[in-house]
From Swiss-Prot:
SUPFAM superfamilies: Cytochrome f subunit of the cytochrome b6f complex, transmembrane anchor, Cytochrome f, large domain, Rudiment single hybrid motif
Protein name per UniProt: Cytochrome f
Entry function: Component of the cytochrome b6-f complex, which mediates electron transfer between photosystem II (PSII) and photosystem I (PSI), cyclic electron flow around PSI, and state transitions.
Keywords for this protein: Electron transport, Heme, Iron, Membrane, Metal-binding, Photosynthesis, Signal, Thylakoid, Transmembrane, Transmembrane helix, Transport
Summary of subunit composition and partner proteins: The 4 large subunits of the cytochrome b6-f complex are cytochrome b6, subunit IV (17 kDa polypeptide, PetD), cytochrome f and the Rieske protein, while the 4 small subunits are PetG, PetL, PetM and PetN. The complex functions as a dimer.
Residues annotated to bind heme: Y28, C48, C51, H52
Family stated for the protein in its record: Belongs to the cytochrome f family.
InterPro entries in UniProt: Cyt-f_TM, Cyt_f, Cyt_f_lg_dom, Cyt_f_lg_dom_sf, Rudment_hybrid_motif
Cofactor comment text: Binds 1 heme group covalently.
Signal peptide: 1-27
PANTHER family xrefs: CYTOCHROME F, PTHR33288
């Protein structure tokens, strides 16, 4: 019950923040959840890349191996230059936010609060985790969060126990991670955001540049089939002027985007304790055998010395 209330509260807080925040909320993993049954396509691409077109580095750190029914942490790193600012939805400059999606193997879940160490509680303070869906507890989302405070996102993970879940097997499995900083260039509807380059739809001469609604600019291009008006929202800076000639597809603005998305895979081994104990027993036997050989050799040397050999 407590876990359900916690998840509900986290979802409500995230939803409110997304709806009232200055940045378009679809810039973060939360919105992949609204449009895709799974955040990972058959090709291996995480769907966040459909809206975040720029590629940026994302890193993940996980233990090489874990024991059943133990808590470990996956650290997703979303680095960027904190001195830069992005274009907000209203065209003003604003700080970047970050988000991440972690796709764990089946059986792995978010660790419950009462299983976290004091260190993990401190590292995860202020981070709200949500499941991708009710039937996918192994897929976790975080964000948006202030990037200057959360370039490292810690996910506390509970490893499964094959003894209590027969569908889980020991061995090596993969973790898929996606990390994002900043807003997207395309909305889920396919429309451009104001955080991307705007180009000319036709070739021709620019005959006028006028102001539009909410700080937008309207660029009029005289083409072969008449005038075409290109509406540029507040944010991108115009790089053309009246009298310029442009080709179809030529940039009318700069590229204001300073963020981007990256993904990475990692591997984790669910160790079988019996095999581990067997290995430790074998190593102990080898060590004892070596010690016995050394002692036997010294005993022989003493006997030989006593006999004057």
């Amino acid at each position: 019950m407590r876990r359900s209330l916690s998840l509900l509260l986290g979802s409500l807080l995230l939803t409110v923040g997304l709806l009232v925040g200055a940045q378009p909320s679809w810039a973060y993993p939360f919105w992949a959840q609204q449009n895709y049954d799974s955040p990972r396509e058959a090709t291996g691409k995480i769907v966040c890349a459909n809206c975040h077109l720029a590629k940026k580095l994302t890193q993940v750190e996980v233990p090489q191996s874990v024991m059943p029914d133990t808590v470990f942490k996956a650290v997703v790193k979303v680095p960027y230059d904190t001195d830069v600012q992005q274009v907000g939805a209203d065209g003003n400059r604003t700080a970047l936010n970050v988000g991440a999606v972690v796709m764990l193997p089946d059986g792995y879940t978010l660790a419950p609060q009462d299983r976290l160490s004091d260190e993990l509680k401190e590292e995860t303070e202020g981070i709200y985790y949500t499941q991708y869906s009710d039937d996918q507890p192994n897929i976790l989302l975080v964000g948006p969060l202030p990037g200057d405070e959360h370039q490292e996102l810690v996910f506390p993970i509970l490893a499964p126990d094959p003894k209590t879940d027969s569908s889980i097997s020991y061995g090596k499995t993969q973790i898929h991670v996606g990390g994002n900083r900043g807003r997207g260039q395309v909305y889920p509807t396919g429309e451009k955001s104001n955080n991307t380059v705007y180009t000319a739809s036709v070739a021709g001469d620019i005959t006028a540049i006028t102001g539009g609604d909410a700080g937008a600019s309207v660029v009029t291009i005289a083409g072969d089939d008449g005038n075409v008006e290109e509406t540029i929202p507040a944010g991108p800076a115009l790089v053309v002027a009246v009298g310029d000639s442009v080709d179809a597809g030529e940039a009318l603005t700069d590229d204001p985007n300073v963020g981007g998305f990256g993904q990475m895979d990692a591997e984790v081994v669910l160790q079988n304790p019996v095999r581990l104990y067997g290995l430790l027993g074998f190593l102990a036997a080898v060590a004892i055998a070596q010690i016995m050989l050394v002692l036997k050799k010294k005993q022989i040397e003493k006997v030989q010395a006593a006999e004057g050999v």
